[in-house]
A protein has these predicted regions:
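Extracellular glycan-interacting surfaces
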Residues: 1-393
């Protein structure tokens, strides 16, 4: 029978939740890296035992961790497998993320725009998102703050920036969102290794069609009333983008305000918020087998980062947007004031698609029936930053 492995990154460690295909009884492993912020964990689709993790600390900085046995043991790439993953400073070059500032690469950028419009030095702070290759377990991409895209081709031992992204002519005008200037979304297109999508808060969405050498903004149709030019080429605070692998080029976006859709690889977007009670939010995802079935969690506002009316409701559209239904069975509908962050929802690929999300007060909820009913598979974790799912044979 198939198994499901849920990877939860939290403010104070990582947790791994495992169940069989029925998804009723869960085993919990963790906390791994107790006390550390674990921004993101994700497994390789080629080798499910290979899991990459972003570990960060205000004291010791950024550390990349890797497991080659499904999360049982961890090591920093470049150190021997089985070496203690103890707290402390980075122990290998795998944790060096150095911006490329050479003019020869097309990215001689040293500053970007700050909140007040002044220029601010580009500084590496942390890895927000890790995206393993669809074809090679040793290739992995990292989206970082301050916003840039890095790639490793040796299992996370060495990292090199793809400088064409920051080298795009708009780079000096990028500025942070409320959570920092982070590259938080990376989507690799199945069957087309040259195409990739990324999203930056608050610069917008970008696409490459040549493997990362050059990039174009894909923000046509977005409207952001909080920037000087609401329809500008860049400057939009994109919170997350999702794509069903069976339909590359059809993208769904949760923006700072507005839920959006593109049917042409991001060249043009249209609003699909429809009857949502509020179209502010962070997460968005797509059913594994129904590419027109989309999930969001509306949040009351950009100043009140909790669910609308104190009710935790996932909204589902079976029509690709505009028509939304509230999914409440098993979710608290009174005095609930939680948030669901941008990387904290995922789906499995079992025949009956499972949906998973984590909250800022430490619950991880699961639905084994496409969202019709929900159960907390774990409670009282630290605030959940990210949720990823592996479907195991």
């Amino acid at each position: 029978m198939s198994k499901v492995r849920v990877l939860a990154g939290t403010r104070k460690g990582a947790f791994i939740l495992t169940a069989d295909g029925k998804r009723r009884n869960w085993e919990i492993s963790g906390p791994h890296f107790a006390g550390w912020e674990m921004y993101h964990l994700k497994g390789s689709p080629v080798d499910p035992n290979r899991i990459y993790a972003s570990q960060t600390s205000g004291w010791f900085g950024q550390i990349i961790q890797r497991s080659d046995d499904g999360g049982k043991t961890w090591h920093q790439p470049g150190t021997p497998p089985g070496a203690p993953a103890a707290p402390g400073p980075p122990k290998s070059d795998s944790n060096k993320f150095v911006y490329d500032t050479s003019a020869e690469t097309g990215a001689p950028l040293t500053t970007h725009q700050f909140y007040d419009g002044t220029q601010h030095p580009w500084e590496f702070k942390r890895v927000w998102h890790l995206e393993p290759s669809l074809t090679d377990p040793n290739v992995v991409y990292a989206g970082v703050e301050d916003a840039a895209l890095f790639r490793s081709t040796d299992g996370g031992e060495n990292w090199h920036e793809l400088p064409g992204l920051r080298g795009h002519g708009t780079g000096p005008n990028w500025q942070p969102g409320a959570g920092g200037m982070c590259l938080h979304t990376i989507i690799l297109e199945p069957g087309n290794p040259e195409r990739m999508y990324i999203a930056i808060s608050a610069a917008g969405a970008f696409r490459t069609d040549d493997g990362g050498k050059s990039w174009k903004p894909i923000n046509q149709g977005l409207y952001s009333k909080y920037i000087p030019n609401p329809t500008a080429e860049i400057g939009h605070c994109v919170h997350h983008i999702a794509m069903n692998p069976s339909r590359p080029g059809v993208l769904f976006m949760q923006k700072h305000w507005d839920v959006m859709r593109s049917d042409n690889a991001g060249d043009q977007w249209k609003k699909i918020s429809g009857n949502l009670p509020t179209d502010f939010g962070f997460v968005i995802d797509v059913h594994a087998h129904e590419p027109e079935t989309v999930y969001v969690v509306p949040i009351k506002s950009d100043s009140e980062h909790f669910v609308h009316e104190g009710k935790l409701r996932v909204y589902r559209s079976r029509t690709g947007g505009n028509e939304w239904e509230a999914l409440t069975n098993g979710l608290p509908q009174k005095d609930c004031y939680v948030n669901v962050l941008r990387d904290a929802m995922a789906v499995d690929s079992l025949d009956e698609c499972g949906i998973y999300f984590g909250t800022t007060v430490g619950q991880v909820y699961a639905s084994a029936d496409g969202g019709d009913s929900w159960n907390p598979i774990v409670r009282d974790l630290p605030a959940v930053l990210s949720v990823e799912v592996q479907t195991l044979a």
